Amino acid sequence: MATKRSVGTLKEADLKGKSVFVRVDLNVPLDDNSNITDDTRIRAAVPTIKYLMGNGSRVVLCSHLGRPKGVTPKYSLKPLVPRLSELLGVEVVMANDSIGEEVQKLVAGLPEGGVLLLENVRFYAEEEKNDPEFAKKLAALADVYVNDAFGTAHRAHASTEGVAKFLKPSVAGFLMQKELDYLVGAVANPKKPFAAIVGGSKVSTKIGVIESLLNTVDILLLGGGMIFTFYKAQGLSVGSSLVEEDKLDLAKSLMEKAKAKGVSLLLPTDVVIADKFAPDANSKIVPATAIPDGWMGLDIGPDSIKTFSEALDTTKTIIWNGPMGVFEFDKFAAGTEAVAKQLAELSGKGVTTIIGGGDSVAAVEKVGLADKMSHISTGGGASLELLEGKPLPGVLALDEA
């Protein structure tokens, strides 16, 4: 993907007095009383918004929340206004809609440096259909388009892709820029040796990532539930562990591919097994070759942690996507936590550490090491598709640098 123009190239002359439509990702978790339980995504959007405010723009923020079918009050963005106002240091104005005359009046009434939050853009089915008429109505609110919502960049929706056709310039926000620099940069031009750690429960969701990474990595470490499909493909007995029977041939071919490309593919040599899938299950450590019937593997074992650790010590760039075990249960979190701690330590020694979205982000946050990593991706699906080498519609729509 070509390099895209960044919001940082727009100066006061380009921005003062202009309305700027900013697609942000404010899809934060709310509890039953509409309190924000994790404001990471809101905080991540602040640098771009503050830059635009500081240059005298009228900022129009657009986001989705959840997957509403039509107008659904529980998916309103209103509960986000107090936190957003607090972080930005201005009183954010809330619109009751995302298009139309009323909204246009609110935009016109904003002072320079003022901020308006549109209501959930997915209240309109046209958003996800990328309806050009709807995109035009969104574009009618502004002069400039900034996409800072990396988490939805893999979707061609009206607010992420369609609107860019009607507004020039269309540029990447600072968060989007950082995501692209790290994720595209790591895959296209990593400092070697380059390792990828891929975990998670299913091989099927990570096939594309593994295949793509086999072209660039020197070392590939596999963990999580997917390892049992690889074990079974090698003829090992896996007890009651999770296996994707229809992916056994694929697992074999991935191991052969790694060998042919000279990639060091490491599978755990020991596992922590449990007699049931529960936080209070009985557990024991066994070699990967000796999983008894009726037991299931829920984490990688201490020998594997040591082997993985020694392999990672040799590297200069590491991408991590997916946990090593069922880290939600404390008893089976040791593997994932050990990887998080080691990556934090290596970051301190100058290794580039990239946490590629999804559950690994939650794992790193659980251990309290998020701020120690070089880059934590805010996108789940978008990070995966980028690592798979797929073009992202929300990025392609932006102006070339």
From Swiss-Prot:
Its EC number is 2.7.2.3. SUPFAM superfamilies: Phosphoglycerate kinase (SSF53748). GO terms for cellular component: apoplast; chloroplast stroma; cytosol; mitochondrion; nucleus; plant-type vacuole; plasma membrane; plasmodesma. GO terms for biological process: glycolytic process; response to glucose; response to heat; response to light stimulus; response to molecule of bacterial origin. Expressed in roots, leaves and inflorescence. CDD domains: Phosphoglycerate_kinase. It is an enzyme of class 2 (transferase). Its cofactor is Mg(2+). AMP binds at residues 202, 206, 225, 297, 328. It holds the Pfam family PGK. (2R)-3-phosphoglycerate binds at residues 24-25, 27, 41, 63-64, 66-67, 122, 154-155. Its main location: cytoplasm. It catalyses: (2R)-3-phosphoglycerate + ATP = (2R)-3-phospho-glyceroyl phosphate + ADP. Transmembrane segments: none annotated. Induction: Repressed by glucose-hexokinase treatment. Induced by heat stress (e.g. 37 degrees Celsius). Accumulates in response to 3-oxo-octanoyl-homoserine lactone treatment (3OC8-HSL), a bacterial quorum-sensing signal. Regulated by light. ADP binds at residues 200, 224, 327. Pathway: Carbohydrate degradation; glycolysis; pyruvate from D-glyceraldehyde 3-phosphate: step 2/5. Keywords: ATP-binding, Cytoplasm, Glycolysis, Kinase, Magnesium, Metal-binding, Nucleotide-binding, Transferase. Monomer. PANTHER family: PHOSPHOGLYCERATE KINASE, PHOSPHOGLYCERATE KINASE 3, CYTOSOLIC. Belongs to the phosphoglycerate kinase family. This is Phosphoglycerate kinase 3, cytosolic. It comes from Arabidopsis thaliana.
